[in-house]
Amino acid sequence: MIIRAGKEIDLARILQIEKRAFPNSAWSKEMIHNELLERSDRKTWVIESKKELIGYCMIQFGPEEVHLINMAVEPSFQKMGLGRKLLHYFLDTNAPNTSIFLEVKRGNFPAINLYLNAGFEEITIRQKYYTEGEDAIIMCLKV
């Protein structure tokens, strides 16, 4: 497994994973392009297996906190610990001495468990946060 910074050439594959992982609420190509290439306060990490991009996480860096804004693993590679590996890489290398926030769908139990096991705590519920009306759990990891 290799984890590296995302590049423009990764855009199509990230979009493909996004649509497979979140079929009812996938980000658009424009949104992913903006996060990957246009914003200086953003960073995208990708994970590869045998030179195939199989997951990514997108981070927003603020002056006092970091926000994990999107993360997905190709569905056929889920339940192999790759999301955990990617999350811990991000935590170990990019988020020293700062609080990290994220939103996760209330019904996304695998992701919720991943974040709880990494030390995140549930802060509050944001009602009907997602486009399809599902609530978001706001989580925080205080470093």
Each model region followed by its residue ranges:
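Extreme N-terminal starter segment of soluble prokaryotic enzymes
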Residues: 1-3
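Acetyl-CoA-dependent GNAT
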Residues: 5-76, 87-93, 142
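Conserved hydrophobic/aromatic "anchor" residues
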Residues: 22, 56, 77, 114, ...
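Residue-level recognition of the GNAT/N-acetyltransferase active site
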Residues: 74, 78, 105-107
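Conserved acetyl-CoA-binding loop-helix of GNAT-fold acetyltransferases
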Residues: 79-92, 112-117
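Short glycine/proline-centered loop/turn elements that form peptide/ligand docking sites
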Residues: 83, 87, 108-111, 128-133
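Conserved GNAT acetyl-CoA-binding A-motif
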Residues: 93-105
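Conserved catalytic-core motifs of GNAT/GCN5-like acyltransferases
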Residues: 101-103, 116, 121-137
